């Protein structure tokens, strides 16, 4: 199996995961969010990491809410290579960016830069615009 990583991040990292939750660092902000792929038990992340800024709690009626545990910026910027993204806590556990997509952004940028011609680009997964920003860079 070939492992494909978005390994050029300096402002983002997955710190830990347990019991359906993923702890991430977004620049200097630590967020704990649900992740249905996390099926293992490494203990309660809220107890193990006192520096968490905010946690997203799902509702049994759908959706959920953020609870700020520490003073948290309303919005902030993170960088990936020469790209800058505006991040904030969104209504459905998201931050406005999917950092794991950076692997695809790299491929997209390489293909466009190596094409030696003008390229028209239609982004059919434009939920955040990350791929569009990468294509333009």
Show which residues each predicted segment covers:
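Non-catalytic substrate-recognition/targeting regions of SAM-dependent transferases
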Residues: 8-27, 31-99, 106-109
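Hydrophobic alpha-helical segments
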Residues: 101, 105, 129-132
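Conserved SAM/SAH cofactor-binding pocket of Class I
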Residues: 110-137
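N-terminal accessory targeting/assembly segments
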Residues: 1-6
């Amino acid at each position: 199996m070939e492992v494909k990583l978005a390994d050029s991040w300096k402002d983002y990292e997955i710190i830990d995961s347990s019991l359906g939750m993923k702890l991430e660092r977004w620049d200097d902000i630590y967020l704990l969010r649900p992740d249905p792929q996390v099926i293992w038990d490494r203990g309660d992340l809220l107890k193990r990491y006192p520096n968490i800024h905010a946690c997203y709690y799902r509702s049994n009626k759908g959706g959920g809410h953020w609870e700020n545990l520490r003073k948290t910026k309303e919005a902030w910027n993170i960088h990936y290579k020469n790209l800058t993204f505006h991040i904030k806590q969104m209504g459905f556990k998201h931050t406005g960016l999917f950092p794991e997509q950076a692997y695809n952004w790299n491929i997209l940028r390489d293909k466009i830069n190596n094409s030696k011609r003008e390229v028209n680009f239609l982004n059919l997964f434009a939920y955040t615009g990350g791929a569009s920003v990468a294509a333009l860079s």
